[in-house]
Design a protein with these regions (language model features):
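Short, structured coil segments at secondary-structure junctions
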Residues: 29, 49-51, 155-157
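Glycine-rich P-loop/Walker A and Walker A-like loops and their local beta1-loop-alpha1 context
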Residues: 1-45
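Phosphate-binding/switch region of NTP-binding enzymes
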Residues: 134, 140-191
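Substrate-engagement module of ASCE P-loop NTPases
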Residues: 117-144
Length: 191
């Protein structure tokens, strides 16, 4: 809970298992799961039968939001302000509970609207979703970008995971900080 994660994946891997695990755990805890992806993507195909998962399917075939099914809404791929609005409404709909958001894929966004717009969108999204009760995972195809683009996007995340053909490998996770109470409990009194 409370992490913003960049999941860099090899498209030949079974990276969707990481998303399935996140969704399964969240649903077991009765937490909402919101996934931004393309219809027919690997993630969409693997989780679309889960009616409790809300999909926002990004496409160039609509210019305004359009309800597709009970748990699927079509959104224009190039309308990042609308995506930010959906993030905002999701947060407002669940003001007290934990929220799980998956954004698949940053690579599609970079290739569709360009890197600068994607980076601006990401800065706003990461700030908006920064809360200890939100778990947010953004996916990036490791083979789709030059090193400068990858490095810039990585810089927005303190938690980075790589999922290759051999499975999941943690790249960068911050050290766990002890709470002040735990620190005080272990220290001698009266200094």
């Amino acid at each position: 809970v409370g992490r913003k994660i960049l999941l860099e994946f090899d498209p030949g891997s079974d990276y969707e298992k990481a998303i399935q695990d996140l969704a399964s755990e969240a649903l077991a805890n009765v937490e909402p799961v919101v996934i931004f992806t393309r219809r027919g993507s690997t993630i969409h195909s693997s989780l679309r039968e889960q009616k409790a998962v809300k999909f926002f399917c990004l496409t160039q075939q609509v210019s305004v939001p359009k309800e597709f099914s009970e748990n699927e809404m079509l959104l224009p791929l190039n309308d990042t302000p609308l995506m930010l609005d959906v993030f905002d409404k999701t947060l407002k709909a669940h003001p007290e509970g934990n929220i799980n958001v998956v954004f698949d894929s940053l690579s599609d966004l970079v290739l569709s609207i360009d890197f600068e717009k994607t980076y601006r969108f990401m800065r706003y999204a990461v700030e908006m979703l920064a809360s200890p009760r939100n778990t947010v995972m953004f996916l990036l195809n490791q083979n789709a970008h030059d090193p400068k683009v990858e490095s810039s996007l990585r810089g927005l995340f303190s938690n980075q995971i790589f999922f290759g053909k051999d499975g999941r490998k943690t790249v960068k996770l911050p050290k766990i900080q002890l709470s002040m109470a735990e620190t005080e409990k272990d220290s001698p009194k009266g200094g």
